[in-house]
């Protein structure tokens, strides 16, 4: 159904994932103020994977690309790195949606682990090799672990 024929409340709800994605990449929230040193997770990864997997057509790839550009500007990374990562997460989620006959939360969850491992290694390999950015591997390990664990609750 076209977006113009929907009632206003359904239009607003259909834009919810996009708005939430842009809020999450703009604010770059962290739990540093709680003095939890290694507690961080990538909420945009969870959001992009979930809505690419479950919400067909709700998350436009162009808007995901622009969210990655905004994330690069906010964090201070080279432009386009986060966009490639976000779009590769979309590709993995769409692949899983197309091959799945019966959805299962546990299978989706472990495929999400595979996805964030591949995309994070791709992301950090490019950043380290080409742009000589220092990476704290403990933070990266805990970030992937907490992102994986929190996907189950979102």
Task: Name each model-derived stretch.
Residues 1-154:
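Terminal, non-globular segments
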């Amino acid at each position: 159904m076209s977006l113009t024929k929907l009632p206003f409340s359904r239009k607003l709800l259909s834009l919810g994932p996009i708005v939430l994605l842009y809020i999450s990449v703009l604010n770059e929230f962290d739990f540093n103020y709680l003095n939890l040193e290694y507690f961080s997770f990538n909420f945009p990864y969870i959001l992009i994977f979930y809505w690419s997997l479950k919400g067909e057509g709700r998350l436009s790839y162009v808007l995901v690309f622009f969210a990655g550009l905004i994330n690069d500007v906010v964090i201070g990374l080279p432009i386009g790195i986060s966009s490639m990562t976000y779009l590769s997460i979309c590709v993995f989620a769409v692949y899983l949606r197309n091959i799945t006959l019966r959805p299962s939360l546990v299978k989706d969850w472990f495929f999400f682990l595979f996805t964030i491992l591949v995309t994070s290694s791709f992301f950090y390999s490019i950043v380290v090799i080409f742009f000589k950015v220092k990476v704290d591997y403990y933070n990266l390990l805990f970030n992937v672990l907490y992102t994986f664990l929190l996907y189950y609750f979102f």
